[in-house]
From Swiss-Prot:
One of its GO terms (molecular function) is proton-transporting ATP synthase activity, rotational mechanism. Belongs to the ATPase A chain family. The gene is atpB. It is a multi-pass membrane protein. The keyword Transmembrane helix applies. Key component of the proton channel; it plays a direct role in the translocation of protons across the membrane. This is ATP synthase subunit a. PROSITE patterns: ATPASE_A (PS00449). It holds the Pfam family ATP-synt_A. Gene3D superfamilies: ATP synthase, F0 complex, subunit A. It comes from the Bacteria. One of its GO terms (cellular component) is plasma membrane. F-type ATPases have 2 components, CF(1) - the catalytic core - and CF(0) - the membrane proton channel. CF(1) has five subunits: alpha(3), beta(3), gamma(1), delta(1), epsilon(1). CF(0) has three main subunits: a(1), b(2) and c(9-12). The alpha and beta chains form an alternating ring which encloses part of the gamma chain. CF(1) is attached to CF(0) by a central stalk formed by the gamma and epsilon chains, while a peripheral stalk is formed by the delta and b chains. The lineage of its organism: Bacteria, Pseudomonadati, Pseudomonadota, Alphaproteobacteria, Rickettsiales.
Amino acid sequence: MTHSPLAQFDIKKLIDIKMFGFDVSFTNSSIYMLLASILALTYFYLAFYKRKLVPSRLQVSAEIVYNLVADMLNQNIGVKGRKFIPLVFSLFIFILFCNLLGMTPYSFTATSHIIVTFTLAILVFLIVTIVGFVKHGLRFLTLFLPHGTPLWLAPLMIVIELFTYLARPVSLSLRLAANMMAGHVLLKVIAGFTVSLMIYLKFLPIPIMVILIGFEIFVAILQAYIFTILSCMYLNDAINLH
């Protein structure tokens, strides 16, 4: 067992693959992202395979998650946002399952790596930009000039708004990766202290550890929610030019 709190984030090659000079090896990160996808698909398949008038607990939980995402889109975008339910729902579920899977002992948290979260963030960024130009054409560029801006202030505001827009995928990805990494490092460090304290305090430190794990699960769910709701807000900017 390793004692370094950062060792849990090490990328390990499982299958070495090279394509056109690029390293596309199958790693522990790959397998946990694949596992998260399989678990999510299995969960919703079992929940909706035999839908009942009186739903099972599994079906109820799946419907709650679906309605949560649908409400996010409805509140942020309105009726026009319904067509994006598959995208936003898939995004939320993938991040949620990756986060929760990383809470199991000796597992790997794919969303603690900036390359994973940045890929998701840049996907959202590109879709938002494409949707904006497809729907509004060049009028989408008015997003970078707030309504009512004085003419003399327009050049500065355009630069600021453009920089803010381009920084979206960076802030979106860093927020998720940093929170997941910080939480897991904290748990690892405190778990090490807990084992040592049990020698002197018996089982007293265990409730503290349980509370911290519960809090980290809450953070895992919250971070998936925050990433998704910010994506909805960005989509709203592209669709309604707010």
